[in-house]
């Protein structure tokens, strides 16, 4: 009985001590670089967040990963080691989000993934992917293509994880919706011209073009 009383007292004391502890949310975004058109708006939204969360004080620490996956991983580790983040959020690009999720799993802290990244194993154990799966997202596109009588579909997208996800989603949806994928053209996020890819794409005479960018 005495042990139970002491244990209960210790638990109550710890609860009281942590009741008003600051919650630190570490965020890495592509505020600059190729993904800035999305990252800037995410940053602006985070800056509007309140100072409390569930009645507890909260602080959002936002770092710029310049839309680079390597920087995103470095930011994630910095947020954990230096800012003592309780949870991670990011990034606005799939490749960067994947790298962050791996860092979160290493540190064994939860992460909210802001892109439809495909994760597995221990990495998925520590992460929650917020957006809908890419295949569900692209099913609406496939439905529209079918409704407009499209048969031949050209594809052009990023030469990274996101471009792969969109293309694979269209591959899986092609047969059920009566579509034929006739191209798989790619370009880097930093490319300033895609003239060559577009010319090759148009030479196949597609009825419509899907852009995974």
Give the positions of each predicted feature:
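Beta-alpha junction/loop-to-helix N-cap segments that form part of ligand/metal-binding clefts
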Residues: 24, 37-44, 52-119, 187-194
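Short gly/pro/ser/thr-enriched loop/turn and capping motifs at secondary-structure boundaries
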Residues: 117-122, 136
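Loop/turn elements at helix/coil->beta-strand transitions in domains of secreted/extracellular proteins
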Residues: 22-23, 55-59, 83-87, 106-110, ...
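Extracellular/periplasmic Venus flytrap/periplasmic-binding protein
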Residues: 74, 126-213
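Cofactor-binding loop segments of dinucleotide-utilizing enzymes, especially the Rossmann-like FAD-
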Residues: 30, 65, 158
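Cleaved targeting-peptide boundary
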Residues: 19-28
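Redox-cofactor binding/interface segments in oxidoreductases and associated redox assembly factors
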Residues: 27, 90, 211
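Gram-negative bacterial Sec-dependent N-terminal signal peptides
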Residues: 1-19
């Amino acid at each position: 009985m005495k042990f139970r009383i002491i244990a209960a007292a210790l638990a109550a004391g710890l609860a009281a001590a942590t009741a008003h502890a600051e919650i630190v949310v570490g965020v890495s975004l592509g505020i600059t670089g190729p993904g800035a058109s999305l990252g800037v708006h995410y940053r602006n939204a985070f800056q509007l967040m309140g100072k409390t969360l569930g009645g507890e004080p909260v602080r959002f620490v936002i770092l710029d990963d310049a839309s680079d996956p390597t920087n995103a991983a470095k930011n994630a580790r910095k947020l954990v080691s230096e800012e003592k983040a309780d949870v991670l959020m990011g990034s606005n690009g799939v490749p960067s989000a994947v790298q962050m999720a791996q860092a979160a799993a290493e540190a064994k802290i939860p992460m909210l993934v802001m892109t439809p990244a495909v994760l597995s194993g221990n990495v998925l154990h520590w992460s929650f992917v917020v957006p809908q799966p890419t295949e569900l997202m692209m099913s609406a596109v496939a439905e529209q293509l079918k409704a407009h009588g499209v048969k031949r579909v050209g594809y052009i997208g990023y030469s990274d994880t996101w471009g792969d996800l969109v293309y694979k989603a269209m591959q899986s949806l092609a047969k059920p919706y009566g579509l034929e994928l006739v191209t798989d053209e790619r370009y880097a996020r930093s490319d300033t011209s895609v003239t060559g890819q577009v010319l090759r794409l148009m030479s196949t005479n597609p009825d419509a073009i899907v852009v995974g960018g």
